[in-house]
């Protein structure tokens, strides 16, 4: 047998080790973090609790600054983990106190989403996105015009809360400036179910942001099977984008209604309340558009639907209505209803004993009002040039540093 001789030069060539995958700890809720510490790091589970507090209470992302962790544990974390938060491309305050952040998603600089903070008397609400874009094609929504790109990760969802809470100086259980979170930003939350539910778990965890379940609201256009699943996995407040009380009109506004018509949607909402004893009502959102869905007959149809819902749940005020004046955006064919029509619509509902509120328009001077959220997706938005200039400017500053 011939002997195979390996040239010595080949023996000297270093073999590059496979890159170690690092776990972004923002992707994990308490249970996931406990498993990571026990199974991957071989550490006690309580260490996960310490790290959660550092990340979500003190907004620390550098393991070396987590001073109650031993040197050996910090070395393990550097090797196996990281804390990656969204990059703030720019932030805009509104004249009414509303604040909007444009956050870059991913490392390629092609995707971004918007997050909005809305202060009010005694409360501060953060509107959080769940997807880059949206694929449901609701005809009156700005986000729908850009199409759907992808789901956000858990880290990208909870990262929005992290960015806002850090900016606000929020201290859970002490100096709470962020009191409510609404999953009403870009995207349909129930189409990104697992990541959204995991992120909401961190929002409600005392080691996270410590929000009561009733102060976290998920808004859906009406994916009936996922509403049923949500009832078994979470007890957050539920809001439904209704916008019409008859199927013909709703199908023209919310195409999803063709698959899940109003009767099926209302039945699933009733099941949600029956299976969730901590929740006693569902909020039905109704965007008022001039000459489209703001006539007295539309109000009477909505009043009848709410009474039927109360009867199905066997509870008064099980259905609450939130009237939203339409917020115009470039290219839309819809107009906002006049103040007279809005008040007349509300009066019909109130006279029918339907608990009804009119949402005050906030942040429309910075395109942060409801329905105006529209982050960059590839090359399809009017702010793409500004987005790219900002990123290029940041890169130049980093290179010069």
Curated annotation (Swiss-Prot):
GO biological process: rRNA base methylation; tRNA methylation
Protein name: Dual-specificity RNA methyltransferase RlmN
Organism ancestry: Bacteria, Pseudomonadati, Pseudomonadota, Gammaproteobacteria, Lysobacterales
GO molecular function: 4 iron, 4 sulfur cluster binding; metal ion binding; rRNA (adenine(2503)-C2-)-methyltransferase activity; rRNA binding; tRNA (adenine(37)-C2)-methyltransferase activity; tRNA binding
Family in the record: Belongs to the radical SAM superfamily. RlmN family.
Alphabetical list of PANTHER family matching this protein: 23S RRNA METHYLTRANSFERASE, RADICAL SAM CORE DOMAIN-CONTAINING PROTEIN
Active site: 114 (proton acceptor), 370 (s-methylcysteine intermediate)
Encoding gene, per UniProt annotation: rlmN
Essential cofactor(s): [4Fe-4S] cluster
SUPFAM superfamilies: Radical SAM enzymes
